[in-house]
């Protein structure tokens, strides 16, 4: 599979339907909808836009605690980023999904992942005046994402 045609949504869908990666019924259902929507032309998939977001996160976003390594997205994260930034409304060309509700199990890096998506939207996505919200059951939890976002790109001088 060449790099241009690589689609993480399809790859993740194949992995969860084959049983190679375990996923719940709702995850399987949403990826089935995404794959069918892309295949039947309900939406346009722009691989270049999806890859741009993934590359930004992996090349400019650093861990905000502990080590200072760049983030390395897992397949499920690449599939989510691809869905957010690569699936477009066929009539308008705008992102199909403008609001995203992520439910991720404990200790899977959801705060850092959300902060990386926020950084891409703030610095690169090109939407003037974009509003980014962090919601959580407690203010302290939402503040973690805000603090992570603030520290995420600090080691990257090329953004300054």
PLM features: residue spans?
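Phosphate/NTP-binding elements of NTP-utilizing enzymes
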Residues: 1-152
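Single conserved hydrophobic/aromatic residue that forms the stacking wall/gate
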Residues: 151-160
């Amino acid at each position: 599979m060449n790099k241009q045609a690589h689609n993480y949504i399809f790859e993740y869908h194949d992995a969860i339907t084959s049983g190679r990666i375990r996923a719940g019924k709702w995850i399987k259902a949403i990826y089935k909808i995404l794959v069918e929507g892309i295949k039947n032309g309900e939406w346009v998939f722009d691989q270049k836009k999806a890859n741009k977001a993934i590359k930004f996160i992996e090349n400019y976003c650093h861990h905000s605690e502990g080590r200072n390594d760049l983030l390395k997205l897992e397949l499920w994260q690449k599939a989510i980023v691809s869905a957010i930034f690569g699936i477009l409304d066929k009539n308008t060309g705008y992102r199909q999904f403008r609001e995203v509700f992520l439910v991720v199990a404990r200790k899977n890096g959801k705060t850092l992942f959300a902060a990386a998506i926020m950084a891409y939207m703030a610095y690169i996505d090109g939407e003037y005046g974009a509003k980014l919200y962090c919601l959580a059951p407690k203010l302290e939890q939402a503040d973690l994402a805000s603090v992570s976002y603030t520290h995420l790109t600090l080691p990257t001088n090329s953004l300054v």
